[in-house]
Structures are given as structure tokens and as C-alpha cells.
Amino acid sequence: IMDLWVREARLFKYGSGTGTNFSNLRGGSEGLSGGGKSSGLMSFLKIGDRAAGAIKSGGTTRRAAKMVVVDIDHPDVEEFIKWKVTEEQKVAALVTGSKLCAKHLKQVMSACHNCEADGESCFDPSKNPALKREIISARKSEVPENYIQRVIHFAKQGYKSIEFETYDTDWDSEAYLTVSGQNSNNSIRVTDDFINAVIEDKDWDLINRTNGEVNKTIRAKELWDEVGYAAWACADPGIQFHTTVNDWHTCPASGEIKASNPCSEYMFLDNTACNLASLNLMTFMDENKSLEID
């Protein structure tokens, strides 16, 4: 698995992208041959995501192009579906939390210095009503107690202000760089059997990768609703229709098509390349600026 990140890094370095179906990796609840439980699909996807985020594609400012595909019957597919939703909620928490902390800590500091009491009394909430009020307000906003006390101690030492970095929701901001799942297009691979199970409101089995046994059974509609909500909330995962793709396969005897390139317009066999070409249509125009297409 780790060798894949090395090979991907080389491809990203020279301006190319990758698409990989990770469904052969065992789920987090599956056992290991040496005992214990697997760390699961998501732990490895997060390593690959971090590696991709560190590389500029082709030496430019563009991030690496990466498609991650997981089959709809994988034991960890629910966690995969919710991956970006959860991470973007972390961004929202970072943005809101950082601004609330900065606001309340500034007010605590101000209450320490703008008080009518003398000396140490300014830093004692039982003797400084303004400080008590700001501490209560900060606690109501869930500002960590250690930060509140830190500001009071700083104020005692004569500091008039405290630095507390805030974050924003710009896609290239520090908040987004902090969370995972931001360096790939994520897609689930669905079959006609799954779609029919959704239509007929049947159960759907998630299958262990090691022994082929049923890991968990859920309603297909519930899983489909999770996909719909995640796509609405964060635009991922995309959907690749495995049965349809392979029905249209031009070389079916050579094996299944399991994934696509990062933009998903090219689907073919494992370990094949998507070599794109372009034409300058201006060279096909005549003197009347009409295209000669015959």
C-alpha cells in the first residue's frame, strides 16, 4: 500500500493524475492474520490524501489530480461516504470556534485592565464584576478553561493583548489544509443489484474482504440516502455505475473496469493510461471563419 503512494507521487510530480479502486483493502472491523483488527480502509486513504496534498502537479500551482473509488459493498463504505462531510464540519468548527475564542479572550483581557479595583483585585473575578461577566460569557461559548486562565495570567504579567489565530472558509486556507479528504475526487461504485435493492426497499450486505462473509446488513435506501445527503452537503461522493460501465466495455475478455481517471471521463483496464490530446480548431477555419468539418 505504501508503495502506491510513492508511485502516485512520481506521477503527480510530472503532471499526471491517478484513479484507484481501494475496495480490496479490508475493513476496520476485519481481523488480521497475526491477531487484532485492521486499521481499516480510511486510515490508508488519509495517508494517500495527505501525500497528494503535499505535491504540486507537474511543478505548477495545481494540486495533484486523484480519484478514489470504493465499491458500495465495502464494510467501510458508510465512513467513506461521510468522509468529506465530517471533515468540512471540522472546518466550520475551526472557523466559528477560532473567532469565538478570539472574541471572548480579547474581552477577558480587556476586563482585566479596564477595572475600577486596584492591584491583584483586577484579576480576581470575585472582586472584578466585569471580569466575572466575561468569564461566564466565555464559558457559555465553550471557550476552554485553560485558555481563559492563560489570558488572566498574561494580563497579570502586563500584557495588553493576546494573539489567537482565526480561520476562514477559503478552499485554500489553513482550515482546509488542516483536515483530510480535500485532495481527491471520491466516488462510490454501484451495481444494478444495489440500485434494484434501493428501488425495491431491500436489505444490502456489506462484505468482508478477507473471507467474503457478510460484515453488516443495512437497508439499501438508507445507504442511498447517505450518499444523497453527502453529495448535497459537500459534492462528494460521485457515483460510478459499475454494471453499466462494464456493459459498454470494449475489451471485456481482458478484465473488469473498476475505476476511472480523476475526471472520470476515461474508464478502462487496471494499470492503463489516459493519454489526452487536443486539437487547435482555429486551424480548421476557412477565410469566412467557418469550420471545415467534411
Question: What feature does the model see in each segment?
Answer:
Residues 25-26, 34-47, 60-64, 69-237, ...:
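Conserved, charged catalytic cores of large soluble enzymes
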